[in-house]
């Protein structure tokens, strides 16, 4: 199993389930779309998808929140683009990239336990990200499964 997570040659050889590749493609596409939407229209996305009440903060604080939010989206976009490269060119790294995506989500959730985000209502972004994490776990298991 560890040989599949950390393959000696990183090439286009892939022995996991084909369904895992489709799941990986879907997850990467959604992450890229989410990231670009935040970078292009962060104010609206922060309020609607993530339920962050920006109007409750002074203008300078809201701008700082948006800047941090957008930088986080840029980092997520970079990770997602690396995942896309793995999907199309270095498929032996797909299981490792599933782990990277999963740890990225889990790390964020741990941080939010100590520094919670104040949200209004039940924003859809939280649910979408939880579903994407579930698909990531399923995809990881399928990518490690020998055909």
Map each language-model feature to its residues:
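Membrane-helix interface motif
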Residues: 39-48, 99-104, 114
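N-terminal signal-anchor transmembrane alpha helix
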Residues: 15-44
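Juxtamembrane helix-break-helix junctions at the cytosolic face
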Residues: 80-95
């Amino acid at each position: 199993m560890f040989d599949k997570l950390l393959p000696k040659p990183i090439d286009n050889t892939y022995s996991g389930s084909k369904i895992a590749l489709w799941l990986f493609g879907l997850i990467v596409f959604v992450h890229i779309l989410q990231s670009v939407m935040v970078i292009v229209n962060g104010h609206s996305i922060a309020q609607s998808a993530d339920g962050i009440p920006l109007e409750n903060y002074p203008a300078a604080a809201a701008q700082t929140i948006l800047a941090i939010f957008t930088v986080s989206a840029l980092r997520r976009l970079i990770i997602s683009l690396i995942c896309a490269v793995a999907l199309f060119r270095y498929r032996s790294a797909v299981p490792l990239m599933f782990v990277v995506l999963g740890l990225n989500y889990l790390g964020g959730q741990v941080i939010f336990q100590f520094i919670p985000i104040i949200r209004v209502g039940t924003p859809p972004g939280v649910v979408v990200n939880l579903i994407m994490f579930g698909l990531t776990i399923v995809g990881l298991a399928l990518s490690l499964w020998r055909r």
